[in-house]
Amino acid sequence: MKVLHFVILLCVLVFPLRAFAATPDLPALLFVEAAASEAAYSGELSELLRARLTAAGWEIVGAETVGHRGTVGRFFHMVRRDADGAELHLIAFPGTERGSDVWTDLRMKRAAFGGHAPAEFLAVRDTPKEERGGMPLVHRGFLDYCQAALFTDAAEGETAGERLAADLRAHPSEKLYLTGHSLGGAAAILAAARLSDLGVSPDQLIVTTFGAPAVGNEDFVRTYQDRFTLRRVVMRGDPVKDVLPSPLGFHHFGERIDWQPARTTAAFPHTMTVYVDAALRRLYDTHDSSGALTFLVGQENRTAGHTVYLTPIVVEVDDALAEDVPYLRAVLRDAQYVRNAATVFAPADTSGPLDVTAQARAARTVGAEQMLVYRISGEKLRDAHETYRLTLERSVYDRDGNLLAAGARSAVTGALTPMEVILYLFAQD
């Protein structure tokens, strides 16, 4: 498949290559798609996701198009190439974050959906109300968002959506993953339906949404439910999934996957950062959280540098954060591996105080040039609901145990979860 224009060389945190294998690891795939959906936004975690891992090999193609009545459609086309030349493709649609997005959400009239070319899409959309009996009907704002993003601007006679469809038809063994949060998830569903109308096989279209509303009526569901794979991830306490069915007569379809936010998460359950945190926890629960590389196994890390030795990570937190301790250690180890693949990890011995002399001896044994010591501390803030101040301390020693540098950074959870705060603090170092 061809890469679209105006490539932005960004990168995404620890995306597992084998998440897109012929038989994908579902927890890894869901983490990839959650991270991609968050990376499509702006904000601290989104910037962190976009800033991490050129070595992971992802190129992100960003597009933004103004469509009908000022609707702004946006998407990111993420492409990664394997060593054998095979390409992995993912389309992520941002959710609501701009004034134009709010206008899109509020345009809740129903519009007809169908056609087999962009011009037909518009003609069907404008079908008079009295002639729409038995037709698939969808949310007008979501429809215009999808139309603007993929089926408005034509380059060399084809819109972005038409090029995607042509490439997929020409390569029937390839798959396209579409994802998004809230409004972005609604756009992903409609985009898959449009690509299906352009002749793309159901086996090639895989959609995952996070906290997305229903997009169409019973006729839409009946027409498209077997024409692509749809997984709907729903967070407990997220009200958006129930916003549209009653007033517009819309229906959900596809496989529903229920998640629950971590107890230490203070953010509103609809927030995409809550979904990212839950996806990462499930990934660690599936794989060995005591080892690094949990979602980089088998990948070449282009950030390998001089050999360093990472001592057991010391974590001293309030009892309220006790359940998070293994996740905090695991995500910090993975972040260090992403920074330097030549890192040698000490056995995860957390009993007793850290013996710097003994650890320096172990560092020399493995030929490390330097030794890293990390300490995570955290305490709950008074009179604040599940809000914590986390501190990440880092000390660097030479191979003989002499201190070379030390520093500490701290941040408060809230918009970010405890795991995400540790990643954020690590990135500031």
Please annotate each region the language model reported.
Residues 20-22:
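Boundary of Sec targeting at the N-terminus
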Residues 217-302:
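Lipolytic serine-hydrolase domain surface
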Residues 59-179, 197-204, 227:
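A conserved cap/lid and substrate-binding interface adjacent to the catalytic center
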Residues 296-342:
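A structural "domain/chain start" motif
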Residues 162-248:
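Serine-dependent carboxylesterase/thioesterase catalytic core
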Residues 308-312, 355-382:
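A short, hydrophobic beta-strand-centered structural micro-motif
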Residues 373-419, 423-425:
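Amphipathic beta-strand/beta-sheet edge segments enriched in Tyr/Trp
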Residues 6-18:
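Bacterial N-terminal signal peptides
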